[in-house]
Amino acid sequence: VAGSPLSGGSDPWHTSPSPPRASWTEHFKIDTGPVSYADSISPEFYELERDAIFRRTWLNVGRVEQLPRKGSYFTKELDAARASVVVVRGTDGEVRAFHNVCRHRGNKLVWDDYPREETKGTCRAFTCKYHAWRYDLEGKLTFVQQESEFFGIDTSKYGLMQVQTEVWEGFIFVNLDPENTTPLKTYLGKFAQGIDGYPFHKLTQVHKYRAEIGSNWKLFIDAFAEFYHAPILHAGQYESGEAAKIKKYGYEALSYDIDGPHSMVSSWGGIAPPKEKAMVKPIERVLRSGLFGPWDAPDIGMTTEELPPAINPTRNEVWGMDSFVFFPNFMLLIWRPNWVLTYHYWPTSYNTHIFEGTCYFVPPENGFQRLQQELAAVTFKEYGLQDGNTLEATQTMLESRTVDQFPLCDQEVLLRHLHNTTQSYVREYQQRNAPAPTS
């Protein structure tokens, strides 16, 4: 079993969720047999995912810091949901999202040089490039070019189509399904409840990277949901002696947990700072930073012991990081040295997706701290490149259909859960939309 259960107690967060004699997979009542990756190589299944998942679940599209003032906006391309949205802070200070489409002839409303590229800015109103229809920041149609030429048009009926929008701890979510009445906080479940109060608002130094990956979106989530591969694929990121030790002993998690469609893994973090400086590379010794972030944790207003209960749920002394997957495609990683990393996986086809990584730090107070953060950010980019390259090789061979059954170990329990969840959403959608039987 990966990790060791702690003693019991009434607090569900501060005890290991795994019983002493069971594997994690069996504990969560997940089948332990070989799995198929047919859901990752099928164009037909991807089309079902678009309607069953991405048009019906809460999707994280950004943070409130991207909208610092009234009139601030950004657009988000949601190819998997067949949509583009514009997210804006209104004159009343509220954050809203609208379908990015003009009500006149369906032109994309907000874009710059290239319609498929995302954009951002500040404005007093949105004006269509095609015929100059204008909308205020709350989506109301305020101007129609040559309005008298239309046949009794009621402009009050042609405002922008609003999208359900809610904010959790500064993260902006949208839901494209007008019939979905589940509040965001309810959907995010116990993990969000247990993270409430973490000072995300203090982490305003942002580093972003983006890549177009030639693999199914779920395969990249799989890569970051297990550490089984880390000692092998990423061996070059460690000093040779440390790499050999990690390869010998493996890299196991402290605990796993599942809540509905969502999941999390809690991990040790012994190299921030390392017990011995010989474990890390010279640049890491000089800058006191690396894979687990800057070694000198900034003040965020709470100690490690005071973190919200879902973070380091076993309260293990060697804890280093927790990784939460909020289904379908938002991964939130909270690190012991007081910084945060998010991953987003935006499908563009059954075998391609856009991967976004964003590092959030407390703003540096001097040049040295800025370099510490830069090293952490570029270190993660290197890890991402190694994973992305490998996943493109995986996708190619899965599509050969030479092998269709794959054994997974206990450390890969969250992979099973992700694919089971995806297939469950698709099955439910198919059943709900099946034609009624004829008499």
Segments (PLM) and residue ranges:
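N-terminal pre-ligand scaffold of iron-sulfur
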Residues: 2-113, 165-166
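N-terminal short leaders/motifs
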Residues: 15-45, 114-130, 161-169, 270-309
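Short hydrophobic core segments
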Residues: 49, 101-102, 127, 220, ...
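Short Pro/Gly-enriched beta-strand edge/turn motifs at strand-loop
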Residues: 56-61, 68-69, 144-149, 324-329
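Short linear motifs in intrinsically disordered
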Residues: 62-69, 154-155, 320-324, 358
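Rieske [2Fe-2S] iron-sulfur-binding domain
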Residues: 66-178, 182-193
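C-terminal catalytic domain of Rieske-type non-heme iron oxygenases
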Residues: 94, 166-167, 171-439
